[in-house]
């Protein structure tokens, strides 16, 4: 049986703007075969949604909360609306503006 698909929303706090965080997030998501999006918020955080096989989503959550882009400093990452989905709602991973 195929691995269950999972969807999760995220928001990352810390020094995450002006440090290529979105570009690296897009790269890491694509490397894992995940879909979704990422964007900067007006309050200095980075937010988005990621979808894909459960194990890959969990790996991405770990990257978002502990690794980030080389110049970033992550204070914390909040995850919400985590749920199992029957099909992906996006065809790729994109940076939103």
From Swiss-Prot:
UniProt xrefs under InterPro entries: Acylphosphatase, Acylphosphatase-like_dom, Acylphosphatase-like_dom_sf, Acylphosphatase_CS
Example GO molecular function: acylphosphatase activity
Catalytic residues in the record: 22, 40
Residues with the N-acetylalanine modification: 2
EC class: hydrolase
Segments forming domain Acylphosphatase-like: 7-97
Catalytic activity annotation: an acyl phosphate + H2O = a carboxylate + phosphate + H(+)
Organism superkingdom: Eukaryota
Matching Pfam families: Acylphosphatase
Modified residues (Phosphoserine): 91
Keywords, comma-separated and alphabetical: Acetylation, Hydrolase, Phosphoprotein
Function: Its physiological role is not yet clear.
Protein name (record): Acylphosphatase-2
Taxonomic source organism: Rattus norvegicus (Rat)
